[in-house]
Amino acid sequence: MKGSRIELGDVTPHNIKQLKRLNQVIFPVSYNDKFYKDVLEVGELAKLAYFNDIAVGAVCCRVDHSQNQKRLYIMTLGCLAPYRRLGIGTKMLNHVLNICEKDGTFDNIYLHVQISNESAIDFYRKFGFEIIETKKNYYKRIEPADAHVLQKNLKVPSGQNAETQKTDN
């Protein structure tokens, strides 16, 4: 698709309805009003994706302080089916990864993926995410209800450096 433009734009009170509509079409789960209220507060961690000026996807994240770590949780990252495999998801995920890299204080980035969503699992694996656990009955009212937790570590564990990791093989 030569000449096509992929851009990311802020989520604002003026376009939050677009985000709601996209999420209703893309995801098998419903998000409540609190989700959308919170999305308006996260700034650069929520973006609409535009393909030639048409909103076709979105990414919404939040900072999570759990397990004595600073983590970034990808609440949603998705794109309308006809616009998949055009680099839109990659642009959204790279945006989030760049934020984490610039910040420098995140330990990891993680998300939940329905166990049957092999294309999403493959997508995240290309970026270095790994399945770290499977949560039984994570989803309500959708089948399969189980979700994989995918995580990408952003910091080398303390006490290790690149040299010791190489020699441990």
Curated annotation (Swiss-Prot):
Any single Gene Ontology cellular-component annotation: cytoplasm
Residues noted as binding CoA in the record, renumbered to the chain: N117, E118, S119, A120, I121, D122, F123, Y124, R125, K126
Phosphotyrosine modifications at: Y110
Chief site of localization: cytoplasm
E.C. designation(s): 2.3.1.258, 2.3.1.-
Positions of the catalytic residues: Y73, H112
Molecular-function GO terms, alphabetical: histone H4 acetyltransferase activity; protein N-terminal-methionine acetyltransferase activity; protein-lysine-acetyltransferase activity; protein-N-terminal amino-acid acetyltransferase activity
GO biological process, one term: N-terminal protein amino acid acetylation
Residue pairs linked by disulfide bridges in the UniProt entry: none
Phosphothreonine: residues carrying this PTM: T12
Protein keywords: Acetylation, Acyltransferase, Cytoplasm, Nucleus, Phosphoprotein, Transferase
Residue ranges, annotated region (Substrate): 138-141
InterPro entries found in the cross-reference section: Acyl_CoA_acyltransferase, GNAT_dom, N-term/lysine_N-AcTrnsfr
A Pfam family reported for this protein in Swiss-Prot or TrEMBL: Acetyltransf_1
Protein purpose: N-alpha-acetyltransferase that acetylates the N-terminus of proteins that retain their initiating methionine. Has a broad substrate specificity: able to acetylate the initiator methionine of most peptides, except for those with a proline in second position. Also displays N-epsilon-acetyltransferase activity by mediating acetylation of the side chain of specific lysines on proteins. Autoacetylates in vivo. The relevance of N-epsilon-acetyltransferase activity is however unclear: able to acetylate H4 in vitro, but this result has not been confirmed in vivo.
UniProt name for this protein: N-alpha-acetyltransferase 50
Upper classification of the organism: Eukaryota, Metazoa, Chordata, Craniata, Vertebrata
